[in-house]
Amino acid sequence: ISACLVGSEMCIRDRYNKAIVDATYDLIPAVKPQIAMYEQFGVAGVAAFQKTVDYCHEKDLVVIGDVKRGDIGSTSAAYATGHLGKVQIASKTYTGFNEDFATVNPYLGTDGIKPFVDVCKEEKKGIFILVKTSNPSSGEFQDRLIDGRPLYELVGEKVAEWGSECMGDSYSYVGAVVGATYPEQGEILRKVMPKSFILVPGYGAQGGQGKDLVHFFNEDGLGAIVNSSRGIICAYKQDKYKEQGMTPENFADASRLAVKDMIADISGALAQR
């Protein structure tokens, strides 16, 4: 019975995801599914994650797998292959989750990052390395001073170094995660990593606003991908959209309105800087 219930839950979640993608794909460049929200349901949840990745690719969206992997050696290589690469069994080649980017934890150093960089070079895909995360306690480690400099800045320098090994046309395949809730640090890190895309979580539900984000972008207005999760997928719960007639039944319409508001907020802030 429990397996049937989980299967039904994943079927509902799959339809929910598709409805939001259908309502927003023409407005956005990328999506960032968080794998833990699927893994908690076991095999059925992982299958729903894969369906979401595949459907987003059908809509020509870049898929950033929010997986935060971090290990060393063959294990790190297996993570990199599973999310971004291909595995060969006998004469056949298979892809795993097949995201375009994956988030990676740098705590284990180069031993944990190099296997991902190798796969990025081979597959022309990318990673976002956790540098300064949006959560309140991130400073417990990330703000610690080493020879007078914060750890997040030193990690940013390593991101730039690793990224120099695998450049695309204008940006590296190695990007960074820097939270919208720390705009001053974002300004510093943008200068440290001028050729890296910055993935910016923390917009919306965590308090980030367009005016906080301008320094995450380069002078040409490019180089950052701003992420809003709950603010979009649960927009129908917000009073501002309820006042516009949004209900749980038309949740996808509320998500579209939230995306439009987000675009206007960020574009307006960039125009005024």
Per-segment meaning from a language model:
Residues 176, 180-227, 231-238:
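A C-terminal functional module that forms or caps the active site or interfaces directly
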Residues 27-29, 33-95, 185:
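N-terminal active-site wall of soluble small-molecule enzyme domains
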Residues 31-33, 63-65, 102-104, 127-131, ...:
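Hydrophobic faces of well-ordered beta-strands that scaffold small-molecule active sites
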Residues 21-28, 53-58, 117-122, 190-193, ...:
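Acidic (Asp/Glu)-rich catalytic clusters
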Residues 1-7, 11-12:
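Single conserved hydrophobic/aromatic residue that forms the stacking wall/gate
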Residues 71-175:
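Conserved anion-binding
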